[in-house]
Amino acid sequence: MVKHNGVLYRAAAAHAHIYPGKIAEKATENVGRFYDLPMAEVGLPHVLNEEGTAVGFDKFLVCSVATKVEQVGSINRFIAAKCEKYPKFVGLGAWHRDIEDVEKELNEIQALGLHGIKLHSDFQGFAIDDEKMLPVYKACMARDLPILFHMGDARSELSAPKKLANVLEKLPELKCIAAHLGGYQRWDEAKACLKGANVWVDTSSSLFVLNPDEARRSIEHFGMDKVMFGTDFPMWTHKKELERFFALGYGEEENRKMLYDNFEKLFKL
């Protein structure tokens, strides 16, 4: 548990990336280079577990991105193995636009005990509202599997908030997490076009840019029951992101929702 102003909170970090040891350092460096940001840690599973546990975290939502379709199976087996090794980990499956048998792949993801899928359209080279992805979204919706979408980047339209809004116009029951408070560098656009009963957001890679008033406007737009704390590990440490989160000045009830309760409810833990 984490402690703030004498109050103890259960805490889940709802956005973390992990990589196998042989590629972790290179993968971490590549992400830092893409965003032109220094990385606080290396994306190794044991580093996440140790660093987050030392701060008091109870759960970590872990994922990795497949940039090639042939990587999907091995990534998902890796994520599942690390979730078995580290009981605090809750895993999401990797996905790729070029997967041919959607139902078979989702069966395998669920058989591995994974709780949804992660998409990063900027890294994977497709728009969120690509027609080829609609059968995937429909299949996830039918299985009640959440999808974590990387959202936003001023340099790309592939992950623009409007792209997810286009999908939700067709599939309003799709359970989705719009990462980075709805859209990194595109927070105003996210507030303009994203909201709904099945839209969650996380706070990852947002609080280092937004001042507390700006962050609160985004949080209150989406609703206190739909916001989850996230770090974007290995980009930021849990300690630093917690400091930024508590600087928003919310009360005990709101903190409990965003730090753990919303995460627990979404993933049915």
Q: Over which residues does each language-model region extend?
A:
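Catalytic pocket-lining loop regions of alpha/beta-barrel enzymes
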Residues: 115-116, 130-228
